[in-house]
A protein has these predicted regions:
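Short, well-ordered beta-strand segments in beta-rich or mixed alpha/beta enzyme
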Residues: 36-44, 74-101
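N-terminal targeting signals for Sec/Tat export/insertion, comprising classic cleavable signal peptides
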Residues: 36-66
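Non-catalytic surface loops within mature trypsin-like serine protease
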Residues: 45-47, 93, 126-129
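An amphipathic, aromatic/His-enriched active-site/gating alpha helix that lines ligand/cofactor pockets
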Residues: 5-8, 22, 58, 62-71, ...
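Short phosphate-engaging motifs
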Residues: 49, 83, 105
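Glycine-rich beta-strand-turn "strand-cap" elements at beta-sheet edges
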Residues: 4-6, 16-35, 75-80, 110-135
Length: 135
């Protein structure tokens, strides 16, 4: 299904109005390079499950950040809606992303949060260009 352009603009605008929930301790700071595989995910969480979801995604994100092919794993929370999350994951390749999805920590996250998520939309992307730089 093709989405209207305004829906894409809203998704992109999430970056402008989101706040980062938690940094990933010990996460490597690396540049995103053209060709990197991105998984961008919009999630609406059942309000009563927000704290449980945050604990589960933080555990998953911290483990993912240590994977060899993971360049970035950001957990963002919409400033105007505490139950709306946006995940921005960058991997060296689609194979690295698939390895993440096959990991035990991801399987645990998926099973734990299955009933916490009211709505989920995942958008696979590739980095075309980036102004991110390693520090």
């Amino acid at each position: 299904m093709i989405k209207p352009i305004w829906m894409s603009a809203i998704a992109i605008g999430v970056f402008a109005v989101c706040t980062i929930v938690l940094p990933m301790p010990g996460q490597r700071v690396v540049a995103q390079s053209a060709g990197s595989y991105v998984n961008a995910v919009d999630l609406d969480i059942v309000p009563a499950e927000r704290d449980n979801y945050l604990a589960a995604i933080t555990e998953n994100g911290m483990a993912a950040a240590k994977e060899p092919g993971c360049r970035r794993f950001d957990i963002l929370n919409l400033a105007s809606d505490p139950n709306h999350f946006f995940l921005y994951e960058v991997y060296d390749s689609e194979a690295a992303f698939q390895a993440h999805r096959a990991s035990e920590h991801f399987k645990k996250y998926a099973a734990t949060t299955a009933k916490m998520v009211a709505k989920r939309e995942s958008r696979p992307m590739t980095v075309t260009a980036s102004n991110s730089v390693a520090k």
